[in-house]
Amino acid sequence: MAEGNVGKLVQIIGPVIDIRFSRENLPNLLNAIEIEGPDGKIVVEVSQHIGDDTVRCVAMKSTDGLVRGMEAKDTGGPITVPVGRATLGRIFNVIGEPVDEKGAVAAEAKAPIHRPAPSFEDQATSTEILETGIKVVDLIAPYLKGGKIGLFGGAGVGKTVLIMELINNIAKEHGGLSVFSGVGERTREGNDLYNEMIESGVIDKTALVYGQMNEPPGARMRVGLTGLTMAEHFRDEEGQDVLLFIDNIFRFTQAGSEVSALLGRMPSAVGYQPTLATEMGALQERITSTRKGSITSVQAVYVPADDLTDPAPATTFAHLDATTVLSRQIVELGIYPAVDPLDSNSRVLDPAIVGDEHYSVARGVQEVLQRYKELQDIIAILGMDELSDEDKLTVSRARKIQRFLSQPFSVAEQFTGMAGKYVPLKETIRGFKEILEGKHDDIPESAFLFVGSIDEAVEKAKGK
């Protein structure tokens, strides 16, 4: 099929466009087609072949101003985006155009956003932990280098703040390259993140790709792939260990559902697209470690109506190595990050990988918190006085642990007025071990709230 192949628009229904080509020059599926609109170039992607000479396409930009009869030019291949060092410090849209008003990008190479996942022989696995400096994460559900991590939570429980803190900590402590894909989230948050990165000096090691809430569904469905393509280049061509942040993977599913309905497909469970698992698999299987380098991905997962059994979060679960679940009950206690230590888990929390001390402290913490959870009904009905001395001690330690799992974040400094803390894993394990052993039974529980290491809690108690 020759490049420079021109067709004509025959139907426009919102973001879905039908274009007629000659029979012998019908563009392939997933090809990018360019249309010169009144406000510049509009890129659409082929989704279906209808009859012998018409393709149905999904637009990556608003189709305002397009009319039937306009010319459309087939590019002869998928959407291609700039890759390489030139992308660092810049903001792109889904089709790889810079949107930060800093001029053109002098990228040496471009790569298509659709490509197969690495073959079985090319993949490599490691069992190294990625230290985040966030106590609750490092202790209870540690992250695997080159693994996939999901941050699950309903609306307003702190997923984006946690992602911003991870970007900040990992860029400062590990100096790695990051790619951030903003998929269908708030433009204001994207702007805040960009300014935050400039202030903290990590912008030069990050490429940002945004397809926010106001974009058409085609853009929101493909922007995750655009960010992933940039990350793959750093992994495959430069042998880097890259971090890929996706906020929010649910919006990718949501956009897919919108596109599916617009293309006239029969909906599946809860109104989602019938191809939900396939689309999710095509994206997730490309996020992996190869012999050349690794991609560690952290994905925020919005949970509709706090229901973890909804098909969108449930499909995402299957692909993850670690899940960090944010809980509204913990938000109500005023403890941040609101990570649920009993619901969050990780494949890496295994004595063979993290060592016996880390494993036993983590399980000890969960045991105490679980016992406290069981005792809460008794406390609510009968009060603390009816508990045995042993249970009273358990409750006291559990409340200290609960508060010690909180931590001030660097990225939230302007809201809280508290300096952010990065806590090394050794310090985290030591702190919780001392609480479990009863070394700090005499310290009031308020001293453990929003501190870094255990020494700070002791100092805070002395200061009172």
Swiss-Prot record:
Keyword Transmembrane among UniProt keywords: no
EC id: 7.1.2.2
InterPro entries: AAA+_ATPase, ATP-synt_VA_C, ATP_synth_F1_bsu, ATPase_a/bsu_AS, ATPase_alpha/beta_chains, ATPase_F1/V1/A1_a/bsu_N, ATPase_F1/V1/A1_a/bsu_N_sf, ATPase_F1/V1/A1_a/bsu_nucl-bd
S-adenosyl-L-methionine is among the record's keywords: no
GO terms under cellular component: plasma membrane; proton-transporting ATP synthase complex
Residues at which ATP binds: 153-160
Swiss-Prot/TrEMBL keywords: ATP synthesis, ATP-binding, Cell membrane, CF(1), Hydrogen ion transport, Ion transport, Membrane, Nucleotide-binding, Translocase, Transport
Lineage: superkingdom: Bacteria
Cellular compartment(s): Cell membrane
Enzyme class: translocase
Entry membrane topology: Peripheral membrane protein
CDD domains: ATP-synt_F1_beta_C, ATP-synt_F1_beta_N, F1-ATPase_beta_CD
Entry's Gene Ontology molecular function annotations: ATP binding; ATP hydrolysis activity; proton-transporting ATP synthase activity, rotational mechanism
Assembly behavior: F-type ATPases have 2 components, CF(1) - the catalytic core - and CF(0) - the membrane proton channel. CF(1) has five subunits: alpha(3), beta(3), gamma(1), delta(1), epsilon(1). CF(0) has three main subunits: a(1), b(2) and c(9-12). The alpha and beta chains form an alternating ring which encloses part of the gamma chain. CF(1) is attached to CF(0) by a central stalk formed by the gamma and epsilon chains, while a peripheral stalk is formed by the delta and b chains.
Record family assignment: Belongs to the ATPase alpha/beta chains family.
Designated name of the protein: ATP synthase subunit beta
Native source organism of the sequence: Alkaliphilus oremlandii (strain OhILAs) (Clostridium oremlandii (strain OhILAs))
